[in-house]
Amino acid sequence: MKIQAPKGTKDVLPEESYMWQYVENKFREVCKLYGYQEVRFPTFEYTELFQRGVGDTTDIVQKEMYTFLDKGGRSITLRPEGTASTARLFIEHGFASRPMPQRFYYIISAFRYENTQGGRFREFHQFGIENFGSSSPVTDAEVISLAYNFFTSLGLDNITVNINSIGCPVCRKEYVKNLKEYFSANSQKLCHTCHQRLDKNPMRILDCKEEGCKLITKDAPKPIDYLCDDCKSHFESVKTYLDSAMVSYKVDPFIVRGLDYYTKTVFEIVATVSDKELAICGGGRYDNLIEQIGGPSIAGIGFAIGVERLLMLLEQNGLLPARSQVPRVFVATIGENGIKKAFEIARMLRFEGISTVVEEMGRSLKSQMKYADKIGCEFSIIIGDDEIEKGVCKVRNMKTSSEEIVEIENICEYLKEKLQK
């Protein structure tokens, strides 16, 4: 068998990794501006966390999780998303006793056994934030504003924020009852999966991507029409505060999100690509999740961003920066003394923040210069017995092939000046 990456996974190569670093750093910057702190949690959790947190009736739990028994017979699952793990972390480490709200962000890989067509992966990457402790609509607007401003900081201007409210467990009962009646009357048009959803959780039908189900959904009851006074007031306030935050939005009455823990505000951010909408961020409020997995009654809200989709979008729109050249300087050596001196010169340059590599393979000077050219170095330093004796080194400009003699003690200042031009 040929050894290769498993289906649905992808290696990130050196020529791509700078793009990942760019968006990761941008996300960190924006999160810090909003007062969020990074958390890191295990790649796997006890399966029960996702069964209770994400929901037994969701496609994620029923079809997509990577679950196995460990050697102790415990059921373990590779995380399919980040919210449940962050909620578990919040409970386990006693954050409920700290000042509220608590603001967390994370950068993770997640795992779902999905069809790999259409650019989907079985290991994929997410940026996410979670805000615990505030049930205020101000928090909803702040969270949506953070996501919106992250995308605009990357130069994306063809994005739309779609918002909705799916109400609380009290007012949702009436909505679900009417929704079930509507879909039951049209059950012959539903796909096989949605027939199963009809009894367990009819709201999941609104998420179905099958064309037949999408057509029926257009005339289905809308959760926004069944909101109680409290949920209605909350949603109106969210819209008011988004206006104040200068975040443009549209109300989409059929956004429900694919996870069972959501309450009240839900939202998606989509980008327009070739006249088609591509979801790049999704989130919402989950006021019962902490209690659902064994913690106190504490409200929460958050979102997740698909990194692979985001990078594809940035690349298509020409919004990624040029790859910075690494390394910038190559130290070519002649003889044993040259090798020893190369360590000293490289250490000096690296201390000044100049990316430097030294010859490691004992090649001829001609071969060393070819190598330096192939890896894109801007300058090569040549050091051997003659140069050491005089306290100098040769510096070759790899673009022009011109050479200058520079005193070793001045090499850092010389290259700093040249590399700035």
From Swiss-Prot:
Keywords: Aminoacyl-tRNA synthetase, ATP-binding, Cytoplasm, Ligase, Nucleotide-binding, Protein biosynthesis. It catalyses: tRNA(His) + L-histidine + ATP = L-histidyl-tRNA(His) + AMP + diphosphate + H(+). One of its GO terms (molecular function) is transferase activity. It is found in: Cytoplasm. It comes from the Bacteria. Gene3D superfamilies: Anticodon-binding domain, Bira Bifunctional Protein, Domain 2. SUPFAM superfamilies: Class II aaRS ABD-related, Class II aaRS and biotin synthetases. GO terms for biological process: histidyl-tRNA aminoacylation. Its EC number is 6.1.1.21. GO terms for cellular component: cytoplasm. Belongs to the class-II aminoacyl-tRNA synthetase family. Homodimer. This is Histidine--tRNA ligase. It comes from Caldicellulosiruptor bescii (strain ATCC BAA-1888 / DSM 6725 / KCTC 15123 / Z-1320) (Anaerocellum thermophilum). The lineage of its organism: Bacteria, Bacillati, Bacillota, Bacillota incertae sedis, Caldicellulosiruptorales.
